[in-house]
C-alpha cells in the first residue's frame, strides 16, 4: 500500500526547517513547546536504551531550543520510535486524545493513556501530523482538533492524507473511502500487513499490549 504526505505550513522558509523532517510532518503549532522542552531536559539524565548504550549522551539535548516547534516535535517522535515504540504508540504517548473524563472509553484504554501520561507530558497544538517510520505510516490530530486533516483511500491501495481533500487530483470512481480525522484521532497503514487501520481499530490494538 502506498502513501502520500502533504502538509501546508506557515513557518518562515529555511532549508533546515523544510518538511517533512526525519519521521514527521506537522501542520499547526505547539502551544506547550516551552514546557515540553523543559520537561524533556529534566528527563534527559534518566534516558537510556540498549540501542545507544554509552553513546546516548550524543543525542542530548534531545530537543534543540533553537529549532522550530515542528522540528522539536519530530525529534521527540524520533526518540520514541528509535527506542522500540512504533508510530501509533508514539503518537498516543506524545499527542494523546482527551481521555480522563470520558465515559465512552474503556478502562483498559484509559489505563494505557495513564501509562503514556506517566512516561511523557503531552504536547498540545493545534496540531495535525503525518509520519512514517518502520512498518507504519500515520496521520493524526491533537486533542484540540483545530487543524483540518482529511484522507482518501483508493482502490489501488493509495492513502492520501493532508489538510485539503483536493490537494491531489483523484478520480472519484477510484475512491473507496474518504473522511476527516477528528480531535485526538489517528489513522494508519501497516506496510507489513498491507492494512489500513481506522482510529477505533488502533485504540483496540494499542490497549491490548
Locate each region found by the language model:
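Terminal amphipathic helices with adjacent charged low-complexity linkers/tails
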Residues: 33-52, 188, 193-209
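Short, small-residue-biased leader/transition segments that mark boundaries at the very start
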Residues: 1, 5-6
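A glycine-rich phosphate-binding loop feature that marks nucleotide/adenosyl-phosphate handling sites
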Residues: 92-100, 132-135, 202-205
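Phosphate-interacting basic helix/loop segments used at nucleotide- and nucleic-acid interfaces
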Residues: 107-127
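N-terminal leader/propeptide and maturation segments of large enzyme subunits in energy/redox metabolism
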Residues: 59-105
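Flexible, small-/acidic-enriched active-site or ligand-binding loops
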Residues: 14-21, 170-181
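Catalytic or ion-translocation cores adjacent to nucleophile or general acid/base/metal-coordination motifs
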Residues: 31-79, 112-115, 130, 150-173
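Conserved catalytic micro-motifs used in adenylation/nucleotidyl-transfer and phosphoryl/amide-
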Residues: 14-30, 34, 121-161
Amino acid at each position: 500500500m502506498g502513501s502520500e504526505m502533504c502538509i501546508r505550513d506557515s513557518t518562515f522558509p529555511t532549508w533546515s526547517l523544510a518538511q517533512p523532517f526525519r519521521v514527521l510532518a506537522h501542520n499547526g503549532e505547539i502551544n506547550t513547546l516551552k514546557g515540553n522542552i523543559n520537561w524533556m531536559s529534566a528527563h534527559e539524565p534518566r534516558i537510556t536504551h540498549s540501542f545507544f548504550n554509552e553513546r546516548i549522551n550524543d543525542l542530548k539535548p534531545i530537543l534543540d531550543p533553537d529549532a522550530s516547534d515542528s522540528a522539536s516535535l519530530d525529534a521527540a517522535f524520533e526518540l520514541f520510535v528509535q527506542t522500540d515504540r512504533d508510530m501509533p504508540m508514539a503518537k498516543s504517548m506524545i499527542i494523546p486524545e482527551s481521555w480522563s473524563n470520558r465515559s465512552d472509553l474503556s478502562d483498559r484504554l484509559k489505563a494505557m493513556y495513564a501509562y503514556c501520561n506517566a512516561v511523557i507530558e503531552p504536547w498540545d497544538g493545534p496540531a495535525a501530523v503525518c509520519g512514517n517510520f518502520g512498518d507504519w505510516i500515520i496521520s493524526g490530530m491533537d486533542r484540540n482538533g483545530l487543524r483540518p486533516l482529511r484522507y482518501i483511500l483508493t482502490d489501488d491501495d493509495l492513502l492520501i492524507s493532508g489538510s485539503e481533500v483536493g490537494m491531489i487530483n483523484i478520480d472519484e470512481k477510484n475512491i473507496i473511502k474518504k473522511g476527516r480525522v477528528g480531535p485526538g484521532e489517528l489513522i494508519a497503514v501497516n506496510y507489513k500487513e498491507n492494512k489500513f487501520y481506522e482510529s477505533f481499530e488502533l485504540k483496540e490494538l494499542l490497549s491490548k499490549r
